[in-house]
């Protein structure tokens, strides 16, 4: 028989073990914090003054997301918020993150950013989330630290390995030491914004696969709110089981009446300008007129990026606000000013991503822009007939452009194509903004379209499927 160890010796042994583990755990945490992207969290200094929803706007969609978070009977663990470029997804994610933080729902957040090196790749995603989890769920801190102290190479392992060693196993260890119900009052929402801003479509698909497996295989207790543009590879990932069964989708469309919110935003911001501008006493009244505000609302096409860009341009203490608004409307020459630089940068990035098919895509854009006034129902089938394209090829050509235009699915060929942004036409037809690569010369485009119409009408035996399906709505 083994000799009986006196109780006081056991206590001393446990105390020694604890004293050894504490510095070891702290060393592991220090290693972790060297391999994170601290600027990715919702309240980081790097993201000072991040975009968020203007007061009294986006109330319906914010409430829908918060209802999903608190619904204890829901069957889904992912909420995918998607919509066109510039629709305001990041502002909604930021506002939800702040609301969740206030209510102690937020476990962690990661805001991807295409232009910042440690926030545009998958490499630091899990370590950054873990660094936030050890604060929001302190019971796992020691277990995470010891795991990294014992095996620092975890910091360069795959995302799956990191989730298992730094999230799953620490949660299991904390459950053993703290009881099965220790997570009942801990935050369980993880927010990921701008998934499409992570480099490489393969990385974006991989992230979704890893997160899905963390729920499906390891049953981690978290729910994920993700936001992105509706890029083809992301849509396809969410369409496949089991992720499709685990996901609630929210599309930012006209259901949420964005024009109403944009009007509220513009009216509020113009009031701020009138109250704060150094020459406010001399501003005309009323300014701007209701008609001018309505023009801006219509030009925004439901996308907040246009409205916010306009306000940033006009809200300058060094310029006369009515003159700046005239530049926006094209009444006054813009000179060297670049009022739409932010929007132009967005359009350029999206169009460059479709570079393999850009020449044909621009032909399609020209048809949409210059036949629009004929009130035609311009469907994929019509485009293929008019441009003599192979049947079905339109869906391939436009597959990377879903963030700036509505493209029906292949089994909805009778639905029309349309731009999400009315301002896209202004960009494409302004050489100073779109440059040599994407510029559409109005005269050349009109001439080419007329020549196509004449050629096809003069050659009825050519086998053309051309017909003009006038819109009935």
In which residue ranges do the predicted regions lie?
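Conserved NB-ARC/NACHT P-loop NTPase core of NLR-like innate immune receptors
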Residues: 2-455, 464, 469
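Acidic, metal/cofactor-coordinating or nucleic-acid-engaging core segments within structured domains
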Residues: 458
């Amino acid at each position: 028989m083994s000799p009986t160890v006196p109780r006081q010796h056991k206590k001393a042994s446990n105390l020694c073990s604890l004293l050894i583990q504490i510095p070891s755990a702290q060393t592991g945490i220090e290693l972790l914090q060297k391999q994170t992207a601290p600027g990715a969290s919702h309240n980081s200094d790097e993201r000072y003054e991040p975009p968020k929803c203007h007061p009294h706007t986006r109330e319906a969609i914010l409430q829908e997301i918060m209802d999903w978070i608190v619904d204890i009977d829901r069957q889904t663990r992912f909420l995918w918020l998607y919509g066109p470029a510039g629709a305001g997804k990041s502002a909604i994610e930021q506002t939800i993150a702040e609301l969740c933080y206030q209510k102690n729902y937020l476990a962690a957040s990661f805001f991807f950013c295409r232009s910042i090196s440690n926030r545009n790749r998958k490499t630091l995603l899990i370590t950054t989330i873990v660094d936030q989890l050890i604060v929001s769920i302190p019971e796992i801190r020691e277990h995470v630290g010891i795991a990294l102290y014992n095996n620092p190479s975890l910091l360069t392992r795959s995302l799956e390995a990191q989730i298992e060693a730094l999230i799953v196993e620490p949660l299991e260890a904390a459950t053993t030491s703290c009881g099965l119900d220790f997570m009942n009052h801990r935050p369980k929402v993880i927010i990921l914004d701008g998934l499409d801003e992570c480099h490489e479509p393969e990385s974006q698909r991989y992230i979704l696969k890893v997160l899905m497996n963390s729920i499906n295989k390891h049953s981690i207790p978290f729910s994920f709110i993700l936001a992105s543009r509706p890029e083809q590879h992301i849509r396809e990932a969410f369409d496949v089981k089991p992720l499709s069964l685990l996901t609630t989708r929210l599309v930012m469309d006209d259901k949420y009446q964005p024009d109403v919110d944009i009007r509220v935003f513009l009216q509020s911001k113009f009031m701020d300008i009138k109250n704060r501008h150094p020459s406010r006493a001399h501003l005309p009244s009323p300014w701007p007129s209701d008609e001018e505000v309505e023009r801006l609302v219509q030009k925004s096409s439901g996308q907040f990026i246009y409205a916010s860009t306009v306000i940033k341009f006009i809200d300058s203490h060094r310029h006369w606000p009515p003159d700046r608004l005239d530049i926006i409307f094209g009444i006054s020459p813009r000179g060297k000013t670049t009022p739409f630089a932010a929007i132009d940068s967005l359009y350029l990035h999206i169009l460059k991503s479709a570079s393999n098919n850009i020449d044909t895509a621009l032909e399609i854009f020209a048809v949409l822009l210059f036949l629009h006034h004929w009130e035609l129902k311009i469907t994929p089938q019509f485009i293929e007939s008019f441009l003599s394209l192979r049947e079905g090829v339109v869906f391939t050509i436009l597959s990377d452009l879903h963030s700036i235009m509505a493209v029906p699915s292949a089994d909805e060929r009778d639905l029309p194509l349309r731009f999400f942004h009315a301002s896209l036409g202004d960009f494409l037809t302004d050489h100073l903004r779109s440059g040599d690569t994407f510029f559409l010369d109005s005269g050349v485009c009109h001439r080419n379209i007329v020549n196509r119409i004449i050629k096809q009408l003069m050659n009825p035996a050519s086998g053309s499927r051309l017909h003009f399906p006038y819109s009935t709505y």
